[in-house]
Amino acid sequence: CSEADTMPSILRVNGRRRLEGEVRAAGAKNAALPMMAAAILADEPVLLAGVPHLLDVDTMGRILRELGIEVLWDEDDTVQLRTIDARPVRAPYRLLRRMRAGFCVLGPLLARRGEAVVALPGGCAIGPRPVDLHLAGLKSLGAEIELRHGYVVARARQLRGATIRMAGPDGPTVTGTANVLSAA
């Protein structure tokens, strides 16, 4: 029996004062990053609301700018993403080394531009998390994948649908699933 099985379904807090007011819930970085990367796929501007202003989100914005995406913020944690140059296909190591989620641009670049040159992601405090499932999933869709000097070079004339299992010996990969789904 796990701890979750023994927890009550209702948690009641009895305090001395009645709570009143409003709480603004921030958006989730781990949801925002793959959505920002997926904006590469769009013909029209993409608006994402509730995107938290965090270092990783800023880094993703910098990666997208390198890939020809205009990134505009408003005062309400809304970001507008719009393709202004559909030619760049290279996501540089100097930015991807800062966060693993930058690797999420691989699938959208491949699907949209037919080619992607994306640096292998940098280190992680959690430990090694390989991208083999990302690459296997993209190969299942018809991509040609090469590893060259620390970069993944992916090409596809036309991706095709496939049944793919996005789990390996260490379990499923959320980022890999987002990457492959955005290419499909």
Enumerate the language-model features and the residues they cover.
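Structural preference for solvent-exposed beta-strand-turn elements
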Residues: 1-184
